[in-house]
UniProtKB/Swiss-Prot annotation:
Subcellular location(s) of the protein: Cytoplasm
SUPFAM superfamilies found in the cross-reference section: Adenine nucleotide alpha hydrolases-like
UniProt-listed Enzyme Commission number(s): 2.8.1.-
Primary site of residence: cytoplasm
One annotated GO molecular function: tRNA binding
Keywords for this protein: 4Fe-4S, ATP-binding, Cytoplasm, Iron, Iron-sulfur, Magnesium, Metal-binding, Nucleotide-binding, RNA-binding, Transferase, tRNA processing, tRNA-binding
Cofactor note: Binds 1 [4Fe-4S] cluster per subunit. The cluster is chelated by three Cys residues, the fourth Fe has a free coordination site that may bind a sulfur atom transferred from the persulfide of IscS.
Pathway note: tRNA modification
InterPro entries found in the cross-reference section: Rossmann-like_a/b/a_fold (IPR014729), TilS/TtcA_N (IPR011063), tRNA_Cyd_32_2_STrfase (IPR012089), tRNA_thiolation_TtcA_Ctu1 (IPR035107)
Protein name: tRNA-cytidine(32) 2-sulfurtransferase
Entry function: Catalyzes the ATP-dependent 2-thiolation of cytidine in position 32 of tRNA, to form 2-thiocytidine (s(2)C32). The sulfur atoms are provided by the cysteine/cysteine desulfurase (IscS) system.
């Protein structure tokens, strides 16, 4: 089904490049996304036959555009039985082009909701000078997205984090948090009433960037994050870039390791019962000729 002509698809793909290179890129992204959706059980099968509804978060960055496009292609081809609602949270950052996303979504015939919440002022007021904005900004954004999802009757909030985000988070937790953890592809929020999905979990950042650029999507940079130097994530990204440059394919090897954990070969007694290890009850005795007792 993925070999259909590009013109016979959702408007998000209309005008896509007809090059062999782009077609291979598109098919790879679609394949990896479908793989993650199926592997992590993201689609609910409801007894009443109704379709689950997903809130697809759209920031205006390359990753969220790629996410929206690939989910709509899967749905268009009958491979994703869900209803999709795109959502942009305008957080009141100075210079944010408020009309870009609504106009784009209208043109692409995508159902959407645009929400304005001035979290920018809260972040600037609460975060001390010299500290990073990302943690508080993300927490405020996530809270608003959960609220919107509930108001719209959605069962899941869908985010555009990709393979490289997941790797970077793993190493940030390793280097700065002293734990082995990262962004999971699927989780339930603390309240227990919403799923959080990351369908691009297997997709490389470079592929998202190539795709969004080739499609000429109107990219909106995050000037708030980009205005800060020395961010931990940026430092980790530079380390991973160096490793990848020295050993091409290193990122994918490390990512596969996250899918191949061996608790018995780590050191966390909460994950593996080391105290319960026991030797097999093997009888090592052998029959020997009885030696007469000396008198």
């Amino acid at each position: 089904m993925l070999d259909q002509d590009l013109d016979d698809i959702h408007p998000l793909f209309q005008g896509a490049p007809q090059t062999t290179e782009f077609k291979k890129l598109r098919k790879r992204i679609v394949r990896y996304t479908r793989e993650a959706v199926e592997q992590y059980g993201m689609v609910e099968r409801r007894e009443d036959g109704s379709l689950p509804k997903w809130l697809v978060c759209l920031s205006g960055g390359k990753d969220s555009y790629t996410l929206l496009a690939v989910l709509y292609e899967l749905k268009w081809r009958g491979l994703l039985p869900v209803d999709l609602l795109a959502c942009n949270l305008d957080q009141g950052q100075p210079g944010f082009p408020a009309t870009v996303l609504p106009e784009f979504l209208e043109k692409m015939q995508v159902p959407h909701r645009i929400e304005y919440q001035d979290t920018y002022s809260i972040v600037m007021d609460k975060v001390p000078q010299g500290r990073t904005y990302c943690a508080l900004c993300s927490r405020l954004r996530r809270g608003n997205l959960y609220r919107i999802a509930r108001e719209e009757g959605c069962s899941a909030v869908v985010l555009g984090h990709h393979r490289d985000d997941i790797l970077e988070t793993f190493f940030m937790n390793l280097f700065h948090g002293g734990r082995l953890a990262t962004m999971p592809p699927k989780l339930v929020n603390e309240e227990g009433d919403l799923f959080v999905f990351r369908p691009l979990a297997h997709v490389a950042e470079a592929d998202c960037e190539k795709f969004a650029r080739a499609m000429n999507y109107p990219i909106i940079p995050c000037d708030l994050c980009g205005s800060q130097d020395g961010l931990q994530r940026q430092q980790v990204k530079q380390i991973l870039d160096t490793w990848e440059s020295n050993s091409p394919g290193r990122r994918q090897v490390m990512f596969r390791a996250l899918m191949n954990a061996r608790p018995s070969h780590l050191l966390d007694p909460k994950l593996f019962d080391f105290t319960g290890l026991a030797l097999k009850n093997i009888d090592n005795s052998t029959e020997t000729e009885e030696i007469p007792e000396l008198r």
